[in-house]
Amino acid sequence: MPQSRREAIYKVIMRHDVAVIEDDPYWLLAGDAAPPIAALGLSSTSGPPVFYVSTLSKCLAPGLRTAYLVVPPSEPIEPILDALRSLSLMPAQTMVSSVTHWIQEGAAQEWMRQIRQDAGQRQKIAASILPGKPIAHPYGLHLWLELSPKLDQYRLIQTAQEQGLGVTSSDVFCPYESSPGAIRIALGGAPDHARLQVALEKLADILLSADKPQRIAAIV
């Protein structure tokens, strides 16, 4: 999300004077992302609070069930700590200690660099195989693929699932009644590039077959 869009969102937050929780799991992975919306809130002394939440399970390793919360200076932290204790008592101390050590020693940053490089290679593989022009961040772990208006995305998804491929329809992510004709494709699930390529080639074949005009046999 560009800086201009973040600033526009923060103006809406200020206009309606609402507290906001900014859930931003992929900011570290992007590498070139603009500062979070919460950073805009820190520069304002009279604006509503923006709480910033980020997790390591999305950008570093799925097993690291560790998240961080940045509380605005204007907000008391005690009620938040009470709420967290009532929900989870406390985080796993060994995991938090290990992650903190990795961050302080620079290991986490190096792993992030490797993950970012791998994600970029996966995006290039997808762009070389899939028809059309995928919509994605260069280092994203998923992409969006617009479909031809004549394609039934639900039938397409069912066909893909029958061949062991998991894709998601756009209406899962759209708050409106009508969603754009597109599918979301995750690229991080395949354990290596070779199996990712095989899966994408299967999906490309499904897309190309579905886009061909159906021949209707004449009944005599």
Language-model features: locations:
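PLP-dependent class I/II
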Residues: M1-V220
